[in-house]
Amino acid sequence: MEIFWNTIAQYNEATWWTQLLITAAGILLTTQLYRKPTLWAKRSMKIYMVFLNGWISIVYYMMYCGARGHHHILAIFWGVIAVLWLWDLFTGYTPFERNPKYKVLVGVLYAMPFLYPLLSWARGMEFPMMTTTVMPCSVAVFTIGLLLAFSRRVNLLVILFLCHWALIAFSKVYILSLIHISEPTR
């Protein structure tokens, strides 16, 4: 678990200004989709999603998570999601047509990337060794919220990849918690 938090600390120390800009761009583009869902706004959001998932793949996993086992696989995984968004940009498959049916759930999902840092603080963590808005979990819940908010027709491959990633991550957390519980205390 120490390697996990150390890699997060290194990532946050080196990229926190960029993470703030990426988060601000995401807020701006999401707001634009709600207020003025023009073709430009929709394409800009897809370009942002290509960038965001590419960032997780290259910067987060390849540059800062090298000490973790299997980081290449996760980098490829998030790279595939970036390519799926790129494909969507050129095909126009996901039209980002608003669906107000799940407003409450979407609100919760949009809030989660901002709650992760607060939960880290509540657990006694401090910057830079804490979760932030531009990390895999945050990006995954934001993406699910975005696709749910604009769910008239969505790219199911993106959803399938995110669900597979979530299952892998959940099982990893469960196994690590069992290891942590079974460690003898001194």
Give the location of each predicted region.
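Membrane-helix interface and helix-disruption motif detector
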Residues: 7-17, 60-74, 120-134, 172-179
